[in-house]
Amino acid sequence: MFLRLIVAITATAVSLPLAPRTLSSQAAPAAAAPAANPKDVASADGIIGALYDVISGPAGQKRDWARFRSLFVSGARLVPTGLGQDRKARIRAVTPDEYAANGPRMEEAGFFEREIGRTAETFGNITHAFSAYESKHAATDEKPFARGINSIQLFNDGTRWWVVTIFWDSEREGNPIPAKYLGKPGGSGE
């Protein structure tokens, strides 16, 4: 009985037509979003590189939050995860605007995040990238203060790439970055 119900629901969902221009209307940024630099959004490599570049900079340097916002599809989310003080896993979803509102903290202390490895898979108009990163307060810092993995979901609308979500977790005791995600930055080729 349960199996028949699942099959019926799946068949119904698959047979429902998409509303006209659904993907095109979803791909457009919010009305106030700035136009993207074509180089930033021409490829999966380009948009991932732009993500790291736009949030990085020395103490006192303003970030280009208009450029940052231009990378995201309307409705995009950034989703940090981690452990609370009670050691339980936590999750919080924010919009690109909410993330940018925290920009003064990065600008105050200095913040550099760079990709240290990537695996990516593409199917049709979607790409998923596991992008390993390290974070430093200054580009010249010998050791990072944090490392982790950004799980980045991208969408290509036929004219450009968009960030749909960035979902990340930090490396910590008992949660090291697996070696298979290190050493191949910029590897999607899309």
Where are these regions (language model features)?
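Hydrophobic pocket/interface hotspot
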Residues: 51, 68, 76, 129, ...
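A short, polar/proline- and glycine-enriched secondary-structure boundary/capping micro-motif
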Residues: 89-92, 140-144, 172-180
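Surface-exposed, charged secondary-structure patches
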Residues: 77-78, 82-141, 190
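Short beta-strand edge/turn micro-motifs at domain boundaries
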Residues: 147-176
